[in-house]
A protein has these predicted regions:
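Short aromatic-glycine-enriched beta-strand elements
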Residues: 18-28, 628-633
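ASCE P-loop NTPase motor cores of helicases and related translocases
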Residues: 272-418, 467, 471-482, 489-516
């Protein structure tokens, strides 16, 4: 227990607010003649219960002094008055104040013992049947079973919030399940820290090389690496990594791995005579993608009548001629069943997509435009003048029972003839698998993206793997058009990819480099955001300017810069509400970002439409804060979302974000600090992605040697994936090509 925590105890008098999903409660307790307001994630509480709370007092301007509980122990009501208060609180089914009187009259202070251990005796009360008595007992056991679990897991430093998730996963049998195999906590859907499971295993004197621990380590290693983008790992690397993680010999882990493969907990696939180990769902995803793309590639070509004539008509209408590669892309889009269209900034991808859209619409084809993120979808809509949605919105998320699925799937197909998917480099294998499953057999796919950008945050490297396979028709646009040549952002983006020296630029250009280092770099970035760029260019420092950092750490990492920028742009003021969640402080007016997908959170669109879902990378502004309920309203574009206390950990301050989190977005002005970049993040694709997020202005601030190092390091993040091999395995050798512009 933290020695700094204060302790109070008493009897629950009233429940002011309660969130049943996560156990956040605001309640009043009486003890020592004092009534205290307590709030925190403490699980389910009811009037009449005795509690011991540990935490700290906080003072709020609106709600006064209240106790924020970090730990809460509850005890079954014992004296007659407390037992009656509990029964009369309608916490149990079929029991209200009148029935509570009858139960107390018959059983007195032993009433709860009767409910827990001998519910048949309740049938002596008029109106309580045997079925009702059983229901009362079940609810009582559920209620106090959760309390018991929270207290049990607290000794292993597992929070009440996590304990409630465990209870949801395993129910009243949670403690027995955990005792038999603590490593269940590390698996789906909980994925608790391995050290918690180790602590419980040691409590039960389980050996460090027991089968449950070895197998859990293998699964955890694969899941962890899936979070780093790998869909699979070579067998030898998996064994070595897991061995280092749990300090057990690879030979023992090899036997556990063989058992996991036998029981189909894991899957193995041979690529170039090397065994690769998969989580089964990721192998299924890559195999489904390969099968569908090969099927589309093998299907007969579509007939597009008078295609060249219609392209010429478009050129006359637009007042310009398409470049040869653009014409090639347009032809392939109209005749092939799947196409990859790739190219850097300024090479005419948008112009090409608009031409394809016009020709498809002239043929009365139903086209679905989509992108992986809300910002990317909004940008696609602005560039094409047509409705575009996120992939999640297109498929319609169904989160019934806490499991993500989609309303549109292989049993309920999308009603479209062509899908155009932008920002393809950001799409992970699970999401793309879901999309292709919902497409009709005859539906065509056009994948648009920049293969030189960072790959998806999730597992997979689809765009690069598809291009590398040579199995899918691909056109790579590489000509920079005249209007784009005027932009140093575009010109330098291509210099980065080709490894040529950057043009430094000046204040009259849309790109310039400022040399700086150390703490001076932090001061420069803050000055650019708060003063220089708003004064010189008229940018709003919060809405228009985005700092993109290669890393979270260091003076010019997101963590340090967000503290500085928040205090400069949105400092604390008397009367301005602010809310602390863990190490973060949120204030009205702060720029915030969603950092993980939430498929349940409700939003209201300005204009009346309602929906659900906030996704990793969505950015918004805090509009209001409710201190009593510890909740916030955040506006994201034209949507307002209510974040209750339990969801605040899904938000981060976002004046500065990582380059990885910026994928799929564009900002009027970007500041890219590169004074200190860790070697593992010092590579060309990351620098390129950061620069190409800027629409009107890009300022690179840092050391020239760091810039040169990033530009010269052509290694991309290594990602283990079998998609290229699976695609090629499904194609006859004569159909394979190099994946270049003529493929």
């Amino acid at each position: 227990m933290d020695e700094q925590l204060e302790q109070i105890e008493g009897v629950v008098e009233d429940i002011i607010y309660e969130n049943e999903d996560n156990g956040y409660v605001v309640f009043e307790i009486s003890g020592g003649g004092v009534l205290t307001v307590v709030c925190g994630i403490v699980g389910e509480l009811h009037a009449g219960e005795s509690v011991i709370c540990r935490g700290r007092y906080e003072n709020h301007a609106t709600y006064g002094r209240q106790f924020h509980a970090q730990e809460c122990e509850t005890d079954m009501p014992k004296d007659l008055e407390a037992v009656y208060a509990f029964l009369a609180s309608r916490s149990l089914p079929y029991i209200g104040a009148r029935t509570a009187d009858k139960i107390i009259d018959m059983f007195g202070a032993e009433a709860l013992e009767v409910i827990a251990n001998d519910p048949a005796r309740l049938t002596k009360i008029p109106g309580i049947s045997p079925d009702k008595a059983d229901r009362i007992q079940q609810e009582f056991k559920r209620m106090f079973g959760m309390r018991e679990l929270i207290a049990y897991l607290a000794q292993f430093e597992i929070s009440p919030r996590k304990a409630m998730e465990v209870f949801k996963a395993f129910g009243v049998g949670a403690m027995q399940a955990i005792a038999s195999n603590p490593y269940l906590l590390c698996g789906e859907p909980l994925q608790l820290d391995f050290r918690h499971a180790d602590s419980i295993a040691q409590y039960y004197h389980m050996e460090g090389d027991c089968a449950q621990r070895l197998e859990a380590a293998l699964l955890r290693t694969l899941r962890h690496n899936a979070g780093n983008g790998h869909t699979c790992l070579p067998r030898a690397q998996l064994l070595a990594t897991a061995s280092n993680f749990i300090h057990q010999p690879p030979e023992k882990l090899a036997r556990a791995l063989d058992h996991c493969i036998e029981t189909e907990e894991l899957a193995v696939k041979m690529f170039d005579a090397v065994p690769y180990i998969y989580l089964p769902d990721l192998l299924a995803a890559e195999q489904d993608i390969a099968d569908r793309l090969n099927l589309l590639a093998k299907r007969g070509k579509n007939t597009a009548r008078d295609l060249d004539k219609n392209i010429q008509i478009l050129e006359l209408t637009q007042g310009f001629a398409y470049a040869p590669l653009q014409r090639e892309a347009i032809r392939k889009a109209m005749t092939e069943n799947c196409l990859v269209l790739t190219g850097g900034p300024g090479t005419g991808k948008t112009t090409t997509v608009n031409a394809i859209l016009q020709l498809l619409e002239n043929q009365a084809e139903r086209v679905a435009l989509c992108a992986p993120t809300g910002r990317a979808a909004k940008r696609l809509s602005e560039l094409t003048g047509r409705k575009a949605s996120t992939i999640h919105r297109l498929l319609e998320v169904d989160y019934t029972g806490g499991v993500v699925s989609f309303i549109h799937n292989d049993k309920n197909l999308l009603k479209c003839d062509v899908v155009i998917l932008d920002e393809m480099s950001m799409v992970d294998v699970k999401l793309f698998q879901a999309l292709i499953a919902a497409l009709r057999y005859t539906c065509r796919i056009i994948m648009v993206g920049d293969a030189d950008q960072l790959p998806s945050v999730g597992a997979g490297n689809i765009l690069s793997e598809v291009i590398r396979s040579g199995c899918v028709p691909t056109v790579c646009l590489n000509e920079i058009f005249r209007q784009a040549k005027r932009s140093l952002i575009v010109e330098n983006a291509h210099h980065i990819i080709s490894g040529e020296p950057l043009q430094k630029g000046s204040k009259t250009d849309d790109f310039f480099f400022l040399e700086t280092d150390g703490e001076a770099a932090q001061r420069l970035v803050c000055d650019l955001v708060t003063t220089r760029l708003p004064r010189s260019y008229g940018f709003d420092p919060i809405r228009d300017i985005q700092v993109l950092c290669p890393t979270k750490l260091g003076p010019t990492g997101t963590q340090a810069l967000n503290v500085e920028l928040q205090n400069l742009l949105n400092p604390p003021q008397k009367g301005k509400p602010q809310l602390q969640s863990a190490a973060r402080v949120f204030r009205v007016g702060d720029k915030v970002m969603q950092v993980r997908n939430n498929y349940e959170i409700v939003w209201n669109r300005i204009g009346g439409e309602q929906g659900v879902g906030a996704y990793n990378g969505d950015i918004g502004i805090v509009e209001s804060i409710n201190l009593r309920e510890r909740s916030m309203v955040v506006r994201m574009d034209d949507r307002r979302l209510l974040y209750p206390a339990e969801n605040l950990n899904e938000l981060e301050i976002a004046y500065a974000i990582t380059v990885h989190k910026s994928q799929g977005s564009e900002f009027p002005a970007v500041i890219l600090p590169v004074a200190q970049v860790p070697p593992r993040l010092c590579y060309r694709n990351l620098f390129y992605t950061g620069v190409t997020r800027a629409r009107r202005l890009c300022v690179v601030a840092g050391r020239r040697d760091v810039v040169n190092s990033m530009m010269s390091n052509i290694r991309q993040n290594l990602r283990y994936s079998g998609l290229c091999a699976l695609l090629q395995a499904g194609q006859p050798p004569e159909q394979l090509s190099t994946g270049g512009e003529d493929s």
